[in-house]
Amino acid sequence: LGDVYKRQPKGWQSLSLAGLPSDGLLISQITEYNNALYVPATNGTLYRSEDGLTWSAVENAPSVKYVLGSVKQGTKQPSALATIVDQEGKLAFYAMNESMEWIAGDAVASGFPVTGFSNLQYAAMYHEYLMTAGGRTADNQVVNTTWATMDGISWALMASGDANFTKREGAMITNYDDKFFLIGGIDASNKALKDMYQSIDYGISWSLIDSMVVLPTDYAARGFSSIIVDKENFVNIFGGKTSTGSNDLNQLWRGRINRLIPKE
C-alpha cells in the first residue's frame, strides 16, 4: 500500500456500559443489524443495544452461542442476523429477521468456524451475501476455509485446501479496489502473520499478493484487528494482538493504493 503510516489514537474517551455481564462476552462477534448492535455471551444469551451503551438481553431468543454477521436486504431478499444456536446439545444455524423472528436452518458442519473468523458483506449477481474466512471450529481446529450465505440458515463452502490462504484465525478481510483482501491473522502455532491475499472471484480462490502491495517493515504481524475502508479509500487498521494471549495493541495504521486517491 502507498502512504502507509501509524497513529497513536487520540481524542478517544472511555464510556460506561450498562446491562452487560463482566465476563463471558464474545466481543469480537459484535454485529450491527437493523440499526442495533448484537453480541453473544458464552451462556447463550444474546444482548442488544441501540446506542452501544445501554444493553439488554433479547427476549424469546434461542440459546445463541455465536453471531456470524448480518446479511443486507436485497431487491427480492430479506435481511438477516446470522447466528449459531445450541439446539439440545447440537449446533444449528439460525437467522433472525427484522421483526426479531427466528428461523431455524441447517446443522452446522464439523469444519465450520465458530470463533476467530473474519466476515464480509458483499453483493454479487443481484444478491447480498455474508462470507466467513478462516477461524477455529467447535473442535478447536484452525481452518483456511471460506463459507457464504444469502439467508443465514444455509451456508456453502466456497474455498478450502492447499491452494487457498494458509490456516489462520483473527485475519482481517475487506472489499477494496474491486477485490477481497485478507490480511494477517494468527496461525495454529500462535504465530502472528502479516501476509496479504487477494481474491477476484468473491472468495472462491485466493492468491498471495506480490511486493507491489505490502505492509511497512515496522508494522508488527498481528491478528484480531478491526479494519475499515473510509470514503477517501484509506484502509484503517485498529489495534490487534501479536498472539492470542497478548494485550491489544494501541495503534491505528492507515494506508491506501496511490492510484485510488480521490480526484478533487
Name what the model sees in each region.
Residues 29-33, 68-77, 122-126, 173-174, ...:
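Structural signature of eukaryotic scaffold interfaces centered on beta-propeller domains
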Residues 20-27, 63-67, 110-120, 162-170, ...:
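Short glycine-/Asp-/Thr-/Trp-enriched loop segments that recur within the blades
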Residues 43, 88-90, 118, 141-144, ...:
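A detector of repeated loop/turn-to-beta-strand junctions in beta-rich toroidal repeat architectures
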Residues 222-264:
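Blade-level signature of beta-propeller repeat domains, shared across WD40, Kelch, NHL, RCC1
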